[in-house]
Amino acid sequence: MGLGFKCRHIPPSVYCGGKKRRRRRSKRRRSRCGRSRRRKSCRGGRKTNNPFLNYLRVFRKKHCGWPQCRIAIEGAKCWCKMSGRDRKKYYNQACSMLKKRGRRRRRRSCRRRRRSCRRRRRRRRSCNTCPK
């Protein structure tokens, strides 16, 4: 406490040792030589079988410059305030995606690869556990 009291009456050059404080420059102020500013992409993403996510996709396009956390919070508030009529559009989109979901087929080659890998693993494990 006594030291703090003395510092008030002593000039800063004496008790600070005459050190000058360095100013910190923020990274934003540095000049970008020859770089053009990139525009944030407003791509919403693909349609899903979730009506709320379909709504957020549209909301994200309207509010392009906002951060993702703010888009999620504000979008949820707007979704809660929406009437059933307005939401129906997004429910219909979700239903149409459920119908399209059954049309997709997987490649057979991927299944074969996975099975062969599993067989190899099983063989290795079985050999390691067998007493010799």
Swiss-Prot record:
Residues 18-46, 98-115 have a biased composition (Basic residues). Disulfide bonds: none annotated. InterPro entries: HMG_box_dom_sf. One of its GO terms (molecular function) is DNA binding. SUPFAM superfamilies: HMG-box. Belongs to the UPF0771 family. This is Protamine. GO terms for biological process: cell differentiation; chromosome condensation; spermatogenesis. Keywords: Chromosome, Developmental protein, Differentiation, DNA condensation, DNA-binding, Nucleosome core, Nucleus, Spermatogenesis. The keyword DNA-binding applies. The keyword S-adenosyl-L-methionine does not apply. Residues 17-46, 96-115 are annotated as: Disordered. GO terms for cellular component: nucleosome; nucleus. Testis. Its main location: nucleus. It is found in: Nucleus; Chromosome. Protamines substitute for histones in the chromatin of sperm during the haploid phase of spermatogenesis. They compact sperm DNA into a highly condensed, stable and inactive complex.
